[in-house]
């Protein structure tokens, strides 16, 4: 009997790619989403998941739901028997979190507490949590390994992820029947090789690469480069970009880890290589054959100069490694953008 996995926020960018990998691995994903960061489309399924069904030939169960809606979550856990929960749902824009801290704490913290309480009440004690490299704050050393101090976060988004990590650690400490894998993502980019699903930001993109690809396709005039006076090779911010398909596969490896009664485990999901903003622009120009105009503007509050992973623990303990390099990330991202110039709302 295939195991049911609840995926919160599963219609979004990372969520939809993970749902596809879950289906390919033989799981039965049940997805909830409130469309805050996902395109609705005209059918009964979010457009991203409708396309996932087409790509896999398998069906996805979906319910529109907000993780702050306790009654709806209760009904969901009564209806289904879940083996595990993969928790993506939450607000995720660093800059916005500085402007709207309460929103971030309400959705990310309260939503997660409610989810954990309902999981506990129904005896579902296996969790994969979508955390972030922002929990490390300003790096004291690079590459970042899991032993690097956390909590010196530079923005409320990162703090909310840090607080949730601490809650889950405390929960696993207090009740040894809980198992949790906390995945600290670096910077996901790229798209499924088919070009059918990808990142479709609702509004102005907060992340570099969707913005770059929208400039390349002509949706936006020029890229704003936030600061060129960082202590990096070319003065622009350096990040560890990871292909979203590699990232999604990391969640399948994490589910396998839960079966070992692993307690609380934490892993970086990154490539171990940092690229600057200007290197990413050049790589995208190469993949698209387009010139990408940019202008340098002031630094963005809460940004760090450089951040990249030591991913060796995930390689050792999860048997996971990032297989897709920079060229492939940009080629796949460009294919998605070209086939879907207006994102999921593109009319065929």
Curated annotation (Swiss-Prot):
- GO CC annotation: cytosol
Q: Where is the active site?
A: 157
Note the superkingdom of the native organism: Eukaryota
Give me any GO biological process, just one: galactose catabolic process via UDP-galactose, Leloir pathway
Q: What is the effect of changing residue 335 to H?
A: In GALAC3; 2-fold decrease in UDP-galactose epimerization activity
- Name the cofactor(s): NAD(+)
* Catalytic activity of the protein: UDP-alpha-D-glucose = UDP-alpha-D-galactose; UDP-N-acetyl-alpha-D-glucosamine = UDP-N-acetyl-alpha-D-galactosamine
Impact of changing residue 150 to M on the protein? In THC13; likely pathogenic; 3-fold decreased catalytic efficiency for UDP-galactose epimerization
Pathway assigned in UniProt: Carbohydrate metabolism; galactose metabolism
Q: Which GO terms describe its molecular function?
A: identical protein binding; protein homodimerization activity; UDP-glucose 4-epimerase activity; UDP-N-acetylglucosamine 4-epimerase activity
Assigned keywords, A-Z: Carbohydrate metabolism, Disease variant, Galactose metabolism, Isomerase, NAD
Quote the annotated effect of residue 103 to G: In GALAC3; uncertain significance; 7-fold decrease in UDP-galactose epimerization activity; very mild decrease in activity towards UDP-N-acetylgalactosamine
Question: Which sites bind NAD(+)?
Answer: 12-14, 33-37, 66-67, 88, 92, 161, 185
Changing residue 128 to M does what? In THC13; likely pathogenic
The EC number of this protein is: 5.1.3.2, 5.1.3.7
Result when mutating residue 94 to M: In GALAC3; generalized; 30-fold decrease in UDP-galactose epimerization activity; 2-fold decrease in affinity for UDP-galactose; 24% of normal activity with respect to UDP-N-acetylgalactosamine
State any further remark. Answer: Contrary to the human enzyme, the E.coli ortholog (AC P09147) does not catalyze the epimerization of UDP-N-acetylglucosamine to UDP-N-acetylgalactosamine. Compared to the E.coli enzyme, the sugar-binding pocket of the active site is 15% larger for the human enzyme, making it possible to accommodate the acetyl group.
Family affiliation: Belongs to the NAD(P)-dependent epimerase/dehydratase family.
Query: Could you say which disease the record links this protein to?
Result: Galactosemia 3: A form of galactosemia, an inborn error of galactose metabolism typically manifesting in the neonatal period, after ingestion of galactose, with jaundice, hepatosplenomegaly, hepatocellular insufficiency, food intolerance, hypoglycemia, renal tubular dysfunction, muscle hypotonia, sepsis and cataract. GALAC3 is an autosomal recessive form caused by galactose epimerase deficiency. It can manifest as benign, peripheral form with mild symptoms and enzymatic deficiency in circulating blood cells only. Thrombocytopenia 13, syndromic: An autosomal recessive form of thrombocytopenia, a hematologic disorder defined by a decrease in the number of platelets in circulating blood, resulting in the potential for increased bleeding and decreased ability for clotting. THC13 patients have enlarged, gray platelets with defective function. Some affected individuals have leukopenia or anemia and pancytopenia. Additional variable features include mitral valve malformations, pyloric stenosis, and impaired intellectual development.
What does the function comment of this entry state? Catalyzes two distinct but analogous reactions: the reversible epimerization of UDP-glucose to UDP-galactose and the reversible epimerization of UDP-N-acetylglucosamine to UDP-N-acetylgalactosamine. The reaction with UDP-Gal plays a critical role in the Leloir pathway of galactose catabolism in which galactose is converted to the glycolytic intermediate glucose 6-phosphate. It contributes to the catabolism of dietary galactose and enables the endogenous biosynthesis of both UDP-Gal and UDP-GalNAc when exogenous sources are limited.
Summarize subunit and interaction data from the UniProt record for this chain: Homodimer.
Q: How is this protein named in the record?
A: UDP-glucose 4-epimerase
Query: Origin organism of this chain?
Result: Homo sapiens
Q: What is the lineage of its organism?
A: Eukaryota, Metazoa, Chordata, Craniata, Vertebrata
């Amino acid at each position: 009997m295939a195991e049911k996995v609840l995926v919160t926020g599963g219609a979004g960018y990372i969520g939809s790619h993970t749902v596809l990998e879950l289906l390919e691995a033989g799981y039965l994903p049940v997805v909830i989403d409130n469309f805050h960061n996902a395109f609705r489309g005209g059918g009964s399924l979010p457009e991203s998941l409708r396309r996932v069904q087409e790509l896999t030939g398998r069906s996805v169960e979906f319910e529109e739901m907000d993780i702050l809606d306790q009654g709806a979550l209760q009904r969901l856990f009564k209806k289904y028997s879940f083996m595990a929960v993969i928790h993506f749902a939450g607000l995720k824009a660093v800059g916005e979190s500085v402007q709207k801290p309460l929103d971030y704490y309400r959705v990310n913290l309260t939503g997660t507490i409610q989810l954990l309480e309902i999981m506990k009440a129904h005896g579902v004690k296996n969790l994969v949590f979508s955390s972030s490299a922002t929990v490390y704050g300003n790096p004291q050393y690079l590459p970042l390994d899991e032993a690097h101090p956390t909590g010196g976060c530079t923005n409320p988004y990162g703090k909310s992820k840090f607080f949730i990590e601490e809650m889950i650690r405390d929960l696993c400490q207090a009740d040894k029947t809980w198992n949790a894998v906390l995945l600290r993502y670096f910077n996901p980019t790229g798209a499924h090789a088919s070009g059918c699903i990808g990142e479709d930001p609702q509004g102005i993109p907060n992340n570099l690469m969707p913005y770059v690809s929208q400039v390349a396709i002509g949706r936006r005039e020029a890229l704003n480069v936030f600061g060129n006076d960082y202590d990096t090779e070319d003065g622009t911010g350096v990040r560890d970009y990871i292909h979203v398909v590699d990232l999604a596969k990391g969640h399948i490896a994490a589910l396998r880890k839960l079966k070992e009664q692993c307690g609380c485990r934490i892993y970086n999901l990154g490539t171990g290589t940092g690229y600057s903003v200007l290197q990413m622009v050049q790589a995208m120009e190469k993949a698209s054959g387009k010139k990408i105009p940019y202008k340098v503007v002031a630094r963005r509050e809460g940004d760090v100069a450089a951040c990249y992973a030591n991913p060796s623990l995930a390689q050792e303990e999860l048997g996971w490694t990032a297989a897709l390099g920079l060229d492939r990330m940009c080629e796949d991202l460009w294919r998605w953008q070209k086939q879907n110039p207006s994102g999921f709302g593109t009319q065929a």
